[in-house]
Amino acid sequence: EMQRSLVGSEMCIRDSVYTEGTDKRILESAHRLTQEGILGVVLLGKPEEVKAAAKAGNFNIDACQIIDPENYEGIDAMVAEMVKLRKGKMTDEQVRAALSKSNYFGTMLVKMGGADCLLGGATYSTADTVRPALQLIKTKPGNNIVSSCFILVRGDEKIAMGDCAINIDPSEDDLVEIAIESAKTAKIFGIDPKVAMLSYSTLGSGKGPSVTKVANATKKIKEAAPELAVEGEIQFDASVSPEVAEVKCPGSPVAGQANTFIFPDINAANIGYKIASRLGGYTAVGPCLL
């Protein structure tokens, strides 16, 4: 369903590369996407191993393309391009070694137009999935930072949380960009974004540098994206509970019904999405790099 959202979005996603081609969850997803004609799928791995894993799980991957990074006919061009992108930080030999790993290979495949997006993290750590993208794919025009958000799903309900993975202690201006880009991502996944700029304070009820940072960022967001529904600084309970919102933030178009949550730093964000996932029954999808 999340992949379907991407295909129907303005991002024009048509082909997706999966870095862990033998993982059961990946193969199940590839089977469904290709059988339903939703998306073209590229699976990375040794063909015999990928096919054996698919057969063991009774998944039909006949419509998928399988690429072995260690036996790719276009590897020389890929090496040359990656050496150029790394600007002297890696030798030819180091680049070839990196590209033998599916996380780097998949990222370069996207960079060179062989796929529109990459999905990884089934067995790779978040750091190992994100690092190649940070090194090889630059920010889009107008963006100053790379950030991230998670989409959390529970039944038919979807919410977004950012930045849970990249920026440790974002500045006011960083928070502005994180909020605006997270809202855009939320919209892609079918969420009508109502953005809560989270804090331990609601509209001046508390004091401190973090409160000031979030409050100032909220003002800047309203100036930069006046069409975006945003409230802050605001406590979490006031952002989701209509009863609390009526007391702490009356008349707000966001308070009590927020669905896109921007945290003041990575400590709060990472803890927050994991609490939602482990105790709240949400499935976390991400991090989506913005």
Spans of features found by a protein language model:
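Short, glycine-rich nucleotide/cofactor-binding loops
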Residues: R14-R25, A165-V176, S205
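Terminal amphipathic helices with adjacent charged low-complexity linkers/tails
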Residues: T34-E70
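Active-site rim loops that border cofactor/substrate pockets in soluble metabolic enzymes
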Residues: K84-R86, T91-Y104, M108-L109, C164, ...
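Gly/Ser/Thr-rich active-site loops/lids in small-molecule metabolic enzymes
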Residues: I137-L152, E181, T185, S210-E233, ...
